[in-house]
Amino acid sequence: MLASGKLIGFVPTKDSRRARDFYEGKLGLRFVSDDEFALVVQAGPSMIRIAKAKDFKPAQYTVMGWEVADVEATVKWLNQRGVEFEKYPFVEDRELGIWTTPNGDKVAWFKDPDGNVLSLSQHVR
């Protein structure tokens, strides 16, 4: 049952206007709706509910990510739109913030305006 269901992501925000500017304006996701509980955007076949929270502490780990065909091109595109990537100490590509894992996968991390850690990944098959 769940294997064929559509995945819905959830992230919290304290400021839905700022979140919409980021997720729609900078990430290029399609706006779906905005009500008293959540802002909703569409990412491919997946829905992301950006829950309106009065108080929360963002997690220090990745809460949501996207698998992309070319992580370097996507990082550059997002940089042009004002998205800054995290430069963790273990990341060897200090310019773009892309980490290459021991098996060759590539990962880059960034934060939304509320401090939620998001990621891009490109996987070798």
For each predicted feature, which ranges?
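Short acidic/glycine-enriched loop/turn segments that link adjacent beta-strands
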Residues: 35-37, 58-59, 93-94, 103-104
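Short, charged/polar surface micro-motifs in flexible loops or helix N-caps
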Residues: 45-47, 56-58, 69-73
